[in-house]
């Protein structure tokens, strides 16, 4: 017997690519609920965030989870012909907001990003001006600049990111060997650039670093205990670029969760994170 999915699958066309969206049911008893648009980590499917979506719905949010380009329901898979990088991922955020316009008009809307998804969300606000967004939430996000990692970990980050970028350049894509899933060469190129330089890449004549400094949208930034990919130092470094935005910096601890945490497993015990996001949203001005 085939089970009926508890979400509506939708798609947004982006040239040769399309973005898959999981639109979860509206929370019970909350008409015109605030909306969370969730952007995943590199190579992580939207389906992985089902427990987090449930936790967000339980505290009163309408939830839409996107698949990043080339992952999950977003097709096609990356190939040598894929021509997108960070700038296009940021553009996808705006395209999805436009696609959802009839659903979200007049409602508070938050971009919630995990890892690469958080960078894409923040870049969208920086490059688009942020008029469509009331708040940004970064969970287990950082800029992976090798110099800010604790101890000697940064040397491994520098070597690993540049090796992966080199392989992607030679092969025409990153096959996902042990990390990040299959990725377009441009995504890996831009990711490796941030790790090497501590800066967002300049693409199409647009200075993303300067744009980030103009962001005024409120930001909730939550680091997660035992996150070796985005330790708190990398989130602090990223938040340091948000010189014009009100930033609330928090930490999700093992003591609070009552279970093991890392860059990925926090999703399975995310009710406390959802509660923090609800408190943050309650303080935002109504539309």
What are these regions (language model features)?
Residues 1-25:
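N-terminal cap/lid segment of alpha/beta-hydrolase-fold proteins
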Residues 41-44:
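Active-site glycine-rich loops that stabilize anionic/oxyanionic intermediates
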Residues 46-48, 53-78:
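Conserved alpha/beta-hydrolase
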Residues 90-107:
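Conserved acidic catalytic loop of the alpha/beta-hydrolase fold
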Residues 215, 221-223:
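Short beta-strand/loop motif that positions the catalytic acidic residue
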Residues 231-241:
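Short alpha-helix in the alpha/beta-hydrolase fold that links the catalytic acid
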Residues 250-287:
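Catalytic active-site module of serine/aspartate enzymes centered on a nucleophile-bearing elbow/loop
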